[in-house]
A protein has these predicted regions:
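TRNA-recognition modules of translation machinery and tRNA-sensing kinases, especially anticodon-binding
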Residues: 1-170
């Protein structure tokens, strides 16, 4: 969640855009279009990069070696593409900042903040990509006593979908 601080930069009254992608958790290790972005260099500050404090450009394929699944990495690449190609954010002012277990919400398995460097505030969170697992739907199922299972027609299995959430301050 984006919290209000830094005076006018972050106010309580602003628009937050969210996109939630529901998917079969058994398919998170793959994405049908991953090959189209596998050589894309992503500007990341992984947990292990923090001591150096330097953004490292890694290809999407290289990021799979850090344990991140292709489905998640694909969406990181598409977010970065949007910020570079549509919004024209300068490359050197952009990074994905990986949150560690004590920084991220307990229900997020993977969590990267999208940060943009602002002249007066340094790198500042502007959005994020959160893998929320099945936390939301299992909670709703428990409270409502309604099954949240769906049939994945491609595999024939019943699953509770997992959620990948993209959120951005507008």
């Amino acid at each position: 969640e984006i919290s209000p601080r830094n005076l006018t930069l972050r106010q309580r009254e602003f628009t937050q855009a969210e996109l939630q992608i529901f998917f079969n958790p058994n398919k998170i290790k793959e994405h049908p279009d991953f090959n189209t972005i596998k050589n894309t260099k992503l500007r990341t500050l992984l947990i292990e990069d923090r001591k150096k404090g330097k953004v490292v450009e890694r290809t999407a394929q290289e990021l799979t070696k850090s344990g991140l699944p292709k489905f998640y990495i694909y969406h990181l690449a598409k977010i970065q593409e949007f910020y570079f190609d549509v919004l024209k954010v300068p490359k050197e002012k952009f990074r994905f900042y990986q949150l560690n277990d004590s920084e991220k919400a307990f229900y997020n398995k993977y969590h990267f903040d999208l940060e943009i460097e602002l002249n007066e505030h340094g790198f500042t969170e502007m959005g994020g990509l959160h893998y929320r697992t099945d936390h939301d739907l299992k909670g709703h199922q428990k409270i409502s006593n309604q099954k949240m299972e769906v049939l994945d027609e491609s595999t024939g299995e019943k699953i509770i979908p997992h959620v990948l959430e993209l959120s951005f301050g507008v």
